């Protein structure tokens, strides 16, 4: 996980770790998700692993673009969710499935990591039946919202209107 706020601070963390003989892989999360330039982390060699989240980055295609750039700079990719429901996790599963296989220096298959996609279990309720982990894995099945669950979990009209207004203002 990212231990500090900026890419520059990550560079310093890596420098201090190496200086002290500690070979610990550093992951960048917020420095990719919350900045205008998600490539800066790689350009500065600030991390070993990039945690990419489809929703904040703008979808599966954007994840694939960012992942390609970062991999070309020798960063490993981990796909995670941003506290998504089962519907949002569909996008994370699609992103992992779409990432190309890579091979390490010894021509060994390296499977893209999918960590942090089981965030649906953090919700009391969801708009689908709960996704279940099977031996530490999520099934790559596309879940659709269930009408009864959508109805029972719908926000009150005033809250819905507030969200629509917020979207209009930000658009």
Model features per residue range: what roles?
Residues 1-91, 123-133:
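Catalytic core of soluble alpha/beta enzymes
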Residues 82-171:
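Flexible C-terminal active-site loop/helix
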């Amino acid at each position: 996980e990212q231990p500090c706020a900026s890419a520059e601070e990550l560079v310093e963390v890596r420098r201090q770790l190496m200086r002290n003989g500690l070979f610990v892989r550093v992951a960048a999360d917020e420095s990719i998700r919350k900045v205008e330039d998600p490539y800066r982390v790689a350009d500065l060699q600030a991390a070993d692993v990039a945690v990419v989240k489809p929703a904040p980055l703008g979808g599966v295609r954007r994840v694939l673009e960012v992942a390609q750039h970062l991999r070309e700079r020798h960063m490993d990719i981990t796909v995670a969710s941003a506290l998504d429901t089962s519907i949002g996790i569909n996008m994370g599963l699609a992103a992992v499935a779409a990432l190309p296989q890579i091979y390490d220096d010894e021509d060994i298959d390296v499977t893209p990591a999918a960590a942090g996609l089981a965030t649906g279990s953090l919700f009391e309720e969801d708009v689908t039946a709960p996704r279940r982990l099977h031996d530490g894995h999520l099934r790559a099945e596309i879940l659709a919202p269930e009408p009864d669950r959508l109805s029972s979990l719908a926000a009150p009209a005033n809250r819905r209107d507030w969200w629509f207004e917020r979207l209009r203002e930000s658009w």
